Amino acid sequence: RDQPRSRGLGDVYKRQNLYRDEMAVHLIDQIDYDFSQVEKKSHGLMQRFGSLEVAMRQNDLAWEVQNYLADHPDAVVVNLGCGLDSTGRACDNGSCKIYNLDFPDVIAVRNQLLPAGDREENISCNLNDTEWFTKIDASEGAIFFASGVFYYFLTEQVRTLVQAMADSFPGGVLVFDAANRTAVKMIAKTWLRSAKIQDVGAYFAVSDAKSEISPWDSRL
């Protein structure tokens, strides 16, 4: 999942006027870590491209959430694989409920740096263990979003999760980003190198969402 890496990354967003993440700048000031090496790498072509791609992605996701809340103001906003992302807060309309989901160690850090606010809950879980479904009250509607998350999932894991969500949250909306097979191979060799992904071909990739994902389930 893509998290703020350095103040330089935030500066790229600001210079391009694409995405202003003041929370990212605030968090970097709170984290006791030397970002100098990351800062040096942030000026490379791939890193600059990645920064702009992330900025556009966050804009797109925020638009989808805000658009859904315009019609369902009391709905829940669920950030799948949240890391230290604050998109839910950025889209808060004053009446929605925000859930942030991630692994226990990630949520432990989040609770320190981004304690849950009003109408917000941080949930420790494995997204593939659908026990977390029981903690989401979707009676007023639900929009789920996954930002830079499904790159780490096998295609079958995404399919199983999506079908299970369709069963448990009828009428809900799921928004996520994805890349085609060629791009996933490139990402695995660069940004996801630390994940030690071996069989890239088994991981989630999409070239044509309508023709590839729609057949998974008639409700999609």
Where do the model's predicted regions map?
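Short, glycine-/aromatic-enriched active-site segment of Class I SAM-dependent methyltransferases
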Residues: K185-V200
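Conserved beta-strand signature within the Rossmann-like core of class I S-adenosyl-L-methionine
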Residues: S168-R181
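A conserved beta-strand element that flanks and buttresses the S-adenosyl-L-methionine
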Residues: F144-F145
